[in-house]
Amino acid sequence: MHAPEASPPDGGLAVSTILWFWLPLAATWLMMAAEGPYVAAIIARMPDAAFNLAAYGVAFSLAWLVESPIMMLLTASNALVSDRPSFLALRRFTYRMNAAVTAVMVVAILPPVFRGITGSLMGLPPEVARLVHAATAILVPWPAAIGYRRFYQGIMVRHGQARRVAYGTVLRLATMSITAATLALASPLHGASIGAAALASGVIVEAVASRVMARKAVAALPVPAPGAAAPLTQRAIVRFYYPLALTSIISLVTGPLLTFFMGRSRHPIESLAVLPVVQSLVFLFRSGGVAFQEVGVALIGRSGEHRREVAHALRLLAWGASIVLAGVLFTPLAHVWFQRVSGLPSDLADFALLPARILVLLPAMEYWLSYQRSRFILSGQTRVITAATALEVGGIALVLAACIGWLGMIGAVAGSLAQISGRLASNLFLFTASRSTRAPGTDTNG
């Protein structure tokens, strides 16, 4: 495996090097977390805000569902692109995936199909459905642009150029701002369409920028001698990648599950009202953990030569994230966040406290999960990751059913208990699996 620039070729890997490698990736996830609220804030300041916010939310959800199978292309290129032939093989696979998701988007906006989705299936009012159709049409190139971008981002991460990934995200947000402002001032488009156009243009510009920024890394890929190693085949890529794609799709079930059960719980309105606020706060501290998966893939090494250093950095970041979150949730800062920052009235701020406090260990568990996943990715055992994700979602469903259906708990509290329980099941499953396999780093942190 080609060693990233952030990793010294010999000896140990300094924890400070790992942290500097991780920092721009974490910043990228933080900026991406801000993207949704940012677009929503733009739409909220335009005419017919309620209809357009609803329409944008539906259009984004549809596009996100279509896009989910290509989310792991960054991980795939980080793990698999070691030379020129593997680059060409995975690029061919990426193009095919992009063509497939674009075809699905095109089919989805065909009038008969779209009416079936938004009318028969979702029951949207006609005025909202029309706005959704226009916004979804604008988002047709969005999934493929994300796939293209993530393919080249993975190559940059592998070569120790994680900062360039963050630069691309900044460029995307700037493009979104310019597009939204220009269209709001000089076009007749509705807010939902302007939000979709801002989102699509930002990702397209970032995709082009990622290709340009990855140019030197691609040029540096070695050409192996004939017969030096077996080439990376399309069949091998599919075998490696389809469990990762399935993992992304399964993960999407969590949100609807929480919403479904909370709507049937005690205090459903209050639970649904505080859910996005609590989740947003916790994700601020989880986002660095999501980014840590790419750190593990890039730096642990194919044979696990840097596993101890990466595990040490993992412990520092994981416990640090949960301790800082606890410092917010178990002090007066909690009310400052929920009331002054998030704008919740005092009764809902009080209501949000217990569900949020239950999730205090979720950031640490996110880091642990990313570290565990990275080791299985390096060994090519991606099916184990899919099984762990399915177990997590199944655990969430079972705990929700038990807490709400049998114990009559408040929905928000049950939701937090379910998320912690599901994640713990996933962590423990991967811990157990690592003990019986040869994933890199099995002797450290499970």
Residue ranges and their predicted role:
Residues 103-133, 324-353:
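Short membrane-interface helical motifs at transmembrane helix boundaries
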Residues 23-75, 242-298, 324, 359-366:
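Transmembrane helix-bundle signature of multi-pass secondary active exporters and lipid flippases
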